[in-house]
Amino acid sequence: MVQLTDAFARKFYYLRLSITDVCNFRCTYCLPEGYRPDGVKSFLSLDEINRVSRAFALLGTEKIRLTGGEPSMRRDFTDIIATIRQNPAIRTLAVTTNGYRLVRDVAQWRDAGLTAINVSVDSLDPRQFHAITGQDKFYQVMQGIDAAFDAGFDKVKVNAVLMRDVNDRQLSAFLDWIKPRPIQLRFIELMETGEGGNLFRKHHVSGGVIRQQLLEQGWQQQDRARSDGPAQVFHHSDYQGEIGLIMPYEKDFCASCNRLRVSALGNLHLCLFGEQGITLRDLLGSDDQQDELIARIQSALQTKKQTHFLHQGNSGITQNLSFIGG
C-alpha cells in the first residue's frame, strides 16, 4: 500500500474530516457571536464523503475524525458513520462533539460503527460552562458522557481549552473527576486565530505549567501510537483516567505531524494554520476520478511546510476553529 509521506519524511495516517461548519454553541474561543452563515454553503454530500475517505484509505489513512462545526448537526450524521466504516482500512472512526446530542444518539452512532468520542468540556462549574459556551447544557453534556460509556465506549476523551484566569487553576477538580473514570482529559493550549487575537493575548497560558504539576505529582508520560493525535499523554497508577496536553507552541510540535484536514467544502488543508486549501471537490463527483484524486492529494502533500508559523503570530487563513474543525 502507498503511504502518504511528505518532503520531510513525515508519514500521515490520520485525516480530520470536517462535515459542516455549523455549530449551535457560542464558545468564547471559537464562535463568540454564534454561527453566522456566510452565504449559502453546500457541504460535502454523503457520496463525496465516501469518495474522499476511500481515497485517503488507499493512501494509508487508518484513522478518520469527523469534525465541524458540530458534526451531529448533520441530519445524515449516522449515515456518514456507517458509510465510512464500510471500509475495513479505517480502523478508527472518531468524532469531536460538543456533546449536546449524546444522550439521544450516542448508542445509534456506536451501532453504526463509531469507535471513539471526544467531548468538549472546558469547565466542571456549570455556570462557567454556560459562560464559555453560551449554552446552559452542562448537565446534559455530563449525562451524554455517561451515555457514551453505557453504549459501550471503554474510554471517552474530553477536551478543555486551557485559558488563563478561566480554568487554568481547576486541575485538582478535573483530576478528582477522572480518578474513578476512564476519561482522557486533554488540555489544549489556546491558539491564536484571525478573529481571536485579543482573546489569545489575554488568556493564553502554556500547557507546560500543567505538565510540571503532573510530573511533581508522579504522573508519567506514555508513548504515542502512529495514528494518535498530537497530545502528550500522562498516566498515574492511582487514576483510571489520563491527562493529555496539546501544546502547539512547544518546540518541535510539528516534527511528529501525522494528520491532514479536509474542510466541509472539500478543500485539503495541509496545516490547521496554513494558507488557502487545495480543492478536491471537482474530483469527488464520480468513482472514475479516484486515480486523479489520489494523485492530487499526493502532489499537494509535497508542498506541506515543515512547521506552522504561530510563533510569528501568523495563523494563516484560520479565522476561527469552526472553519476546518480544529
Swiss-Prot record:
Disulfide bonds: none annotated. Keywords: 4Fe-4S, GTP-binding, Iron, Iron-sulfur, Lyase, Metal-binding, Molybdenum cofactor biosynthesis, Nucleotide-binding, S-adenosyl-L-methionine. GTP binds at R16, R65, T96, K157, R259, L260, R261. Its EC number is 4.1.99.22. Binds 2 [4Fe-4S] clusters. Binds 1 [4Fe-4S] cluster coordinated with 3 cysteines and an exchangeable S-adenosyl-L-methionine and 1 [4Fe-4S] cluster coordinated with 3 cysteines and the GTP-derived substrate. It is an enzyme of class 4 (lyase). SMART domains: Elp3 (SM00729). Residues 7-240 form the Radical SAM core domain. Its cofactor is [4Fe-4S] cluster. The keyword Ribosomal protein does not apply. [4Fe-4S] cluster 2 binds at C254, C257, C271. One of its GO terms (biological process) is Mo-molybdopterin cofactor biosynthetic process. Pathway: Cofactor biosynthesis; molybdopterin biosynthesis. Catalyzes the cyclization of GTP to (8S)-3',8-cyclo-7,8-dihydroguanosine 5'-triphosphate. HAMAP family: MoaA_B. This is GTP 3',8-cyclase. It comes from Yersinia pestis.
